[in-house]
A protein has these predicted regions:
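Non-catalytic, conserved peripheral segments adjacent to functional cores
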Residues: 1-108, 122-161
């Protein structure tokens, strides 16, 4: 991370944004902001917020959406977040981003539509990941694509947790 808390050593996929967060110590514990509109430059609203529990060592991959913008925040545990830009015509086509975030190093990761993403729990206990999407899940017509974690369409192999 740079002095401005920007990721070093990797080119961010076009449209991906990362905002690292600092805990605010309080007499009763700590406060952690998950999302503020002024952190990021997108004007997309938040239409749905949900939390996913990911068991120790487990992987949920690969996911992408045609239109939905994901905003992922790890509220508990430690995870590896991997992104792959398979968008033809994107200036970062073929780029992979990898981040290690969690309760001790919190961050908001914004993932644009059509970018494949996967999450691996690298800790020894259940991780909880909050997602704040700009389009609520439509049960009748889901905007959700899924391929297996070991798919040859994504050139990344998750290491053992």
């Amino acid at each position: 991370m740079s002095a401005r808390w920007e990721p070093l050593g990797q080119t961010l996929i076009n449209g991906v944004r990362v905002h690292e967060v600092r805990h605010v110590p309080k007499g009763s514990g700590r406060l952690t902001e998950l999302y503020r509109r002024d952190w990021l430059t997108d004007d997309a609203g938040v239409d749905q917020v949900f939390q996913v529990e990911l068991l120790a060592g487990r992987i949920t991959a690969w996911h992408a959406h045609a239109q939905t913008l994901d905003r992922i925040f790890v509220s508990e545990g430690s995870v590896r977040i991997v992104l792959y830009d398979a968008r033809q015509g994107s200036p970062t086509f073929g780029t992979i981003n990898q981040f290690l975030f969690g309760e001790h190093r919190p961050a908001l990761v914004v993932i644009p539509p059509r970018v494949w993403h996967g999450v691996q729990n690298i800790g020894g206990r259940t991780a909880r990941v909050v997602n704040m999407v700009d389009r609520a899940y439509d049960y009748a017509s889901p905007d959700h694509w899924r391929i297996p974690a070991d798919s040859p369409h994504v050139p990344f192999t998750f290491p053992p947790a």
